């Protein structure tokens, strides 16, 4: 059991909302709740939803960042709400249509949670990640928003495994010379341990932070990742560039193949042990590549002995296909077709930092592509995407595209394009045998859970929470 997360974002063209624009629907909603009339709950939920929408994405983040009083104003407006909700509980119990009134009350609670926890807490998380020397640009804050959202999802996905974790922050248009002494020094680690940097074909930089511990609590690993990001002065320099863009690829691991160590923590990259230069590929993987040892031998993959995870063969083999001149998507397709086992993969390549490749085959894993404002968020469970969006595409690793050829056509491959992030137009989907599988809005599902449902609060484990609530 492991967890995959990825965030791919395009620059937003929505205007940054004013404080008044954000607080007005909140004030209206609180006024309606104060009337303690169940029939008004739906209208109040709509107003709260409008405020949540305005606070979402990069424009909402920038609104909070530019007005240091806004968080306090929002909290002040919402302060009377708990008392109103307590009164409404009794009113709902006496409503002629208790079921409908209770559903509206649940919706109000869900959206209030989204505003206070998902939006305001996300802003606090971004603030904790930033450095003020140098100050991040607005574009840099957008990258930090993606990082915060990825870390938040990893916190939730840790229940699928937590002996190690890793996060790759890939940036381009950053203005840093690839021959900068710190870049050169940090790109020399062949084991891709925490703090490593990889230089992309177009001059972009991929920063990786990792944590590894056999014993620990939920949240320990992401705390280590956060601290490493905050301490990274080179990353801070990149995020100060006015036009910087970035993508995130992360993983939390339960080791099934390979030791618990930083070199084995994902993402793993395509660096060869013999020093031969190959195209840059980085990968996160759930499940096991059962024939990884056979592939390493038959394909002549040069793997460092310190890296014993089966996932290492994925970028190594894909890099070999790229080096042979194959196009990116075809190289990926050939790579994943070589594997035996139930496997989910997220892959980034050095020639296209604005693209993300995904594959899923078998019944034991899952991948969900969330479509949020200007953003794709990918997770191995729906609860990894719901902080950003309720709408997602579920990849199907079992149904054959051609029932007459199930062996070859079972499994799906997806390519995401940051230039059209958040839209089905930015999703290219194919079967394992290369058949085009167009994606429309009819293919999307809607999550039935919210972040309020899956929050474990102050409980160290979900089991303890469930026992306490039973």
Regions found by a protein language model. Give the residues of each.
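Conserved short alpha-helical segments that host acidic/polar catalytic motifs at enzyme active sites
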Residues: 1-469
């Amino acid at each position: 059991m492991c967890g995959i997360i990825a965030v791919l974002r395009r620059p937003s063209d929505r205007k940054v909302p004013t404080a008044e624009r954000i607080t007005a629907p909140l004030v209206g909603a609180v006024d309606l709740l104060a009337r303690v009339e169940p029939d008004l709950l739906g209208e109040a939920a709509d107003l709260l939803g409008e405020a949540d929408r305005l606070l979402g994405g990069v424009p909402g983040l920038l609104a909070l960042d530019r007005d240091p009083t806004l968080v306090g104003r929002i909290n002040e407006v919402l302060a009377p709400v708990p008392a109103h909700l307590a009164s409404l509980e009794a009113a709902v119990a006496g409503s002629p249509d208790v079921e409908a009134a209770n559903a509206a009350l649940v919706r109000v609670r869900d959206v209030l949670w989204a505003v206070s926890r998902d939006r305001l807490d996300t802003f606090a998380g971004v603030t904790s990640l930033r450095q003020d020397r140098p100050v991040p640009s607005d574009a840099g804050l957008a990258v930090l928003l993606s990082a915060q959202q990825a870390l938040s999802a990893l916190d939730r996905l840790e229940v699928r495994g937590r002996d190690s974790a890793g996060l790759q922050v890939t940036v381009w248009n950053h203005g840093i010379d690839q021959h900068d002494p710190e870049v050169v020094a940090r790109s020399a680690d062949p084991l891709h341990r925490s703090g490593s940097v990889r230089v992309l074909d177009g001059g972009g930089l991929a920063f990786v932070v990792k944590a590894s511990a056999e014993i620990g609590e939920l949240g320990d690993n992401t705390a280590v990742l956060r601290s490493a990001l905050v301490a990274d002065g080179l990353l801070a320099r990149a995020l100060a560039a006015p036009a910087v863009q970035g993508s995130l690829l992360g993983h939390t691991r339960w080791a099934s193949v390979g030791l618990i160590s930083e070199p084995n923590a994902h993402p793993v990259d395509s660096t060869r042990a013999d020093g031969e230069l190959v195209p840059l590929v980085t990968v996160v993987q759930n499940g096991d590549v059962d024939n990884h040892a056979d592939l390493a031998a038959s394909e002549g993959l040069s793997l460092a002995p310190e890296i014993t995870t089966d996932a290492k063969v994925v970028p190594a083999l894909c890099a070999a296909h790229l080096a042979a001149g194959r196009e990116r998507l075809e190289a990926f397709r050939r790579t994943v077709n070589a594997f035996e086992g139930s496997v989910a993969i997220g892959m980034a390549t050095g020639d296209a930092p604005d693209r993300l490749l995904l594959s899923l085959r078998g019944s034991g894993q899952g991948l969900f592509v969330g479509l949020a404002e200007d953003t794709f968020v990918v997770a191995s469970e729906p609860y990894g995407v719901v902080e950003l969006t309720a709408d997602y595409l579920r990849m199907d690793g079992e149904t054959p595209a051609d029932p007459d050829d199930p062996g070859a056509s079972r499994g799906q491959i997806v390519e995401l394009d940051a230039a059209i992030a958040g839209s089905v137009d930015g999703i290219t989907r194919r079967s394992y045998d290369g058949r085009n599988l167009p994606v429309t809005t009819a293919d999307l599902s809607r999550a039935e859970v919210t972040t309020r449902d899956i929050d474990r609060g102050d409980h160290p484990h979900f089991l303890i929470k469930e026992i306490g609530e039973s």
